[in-house]
């Protein structure tokens, strides 16, 4: 995802 965006951070993961």
UniProtKB/Swiss-Prot annotation:
Transmembrane segments: none annotated. Belongs to the FARP (FMRFamide related peptide) family. This is FLRFamide. GO terms for biological process: neuropeptide signaling pathway. Keywords: Amidation, Neuropeptide, Secreted. The modification Phenylalanine amide is found at residue 4. The keyword Secreted applies. GO terms for cellular component: extracellular region. It is found in: Secreted. The lineage of its organism: Eukaryota, Metazoa, Spiralia, Lophotrochozoa, Annelida.
């Amino acid at each position: 995802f965006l951070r993961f």
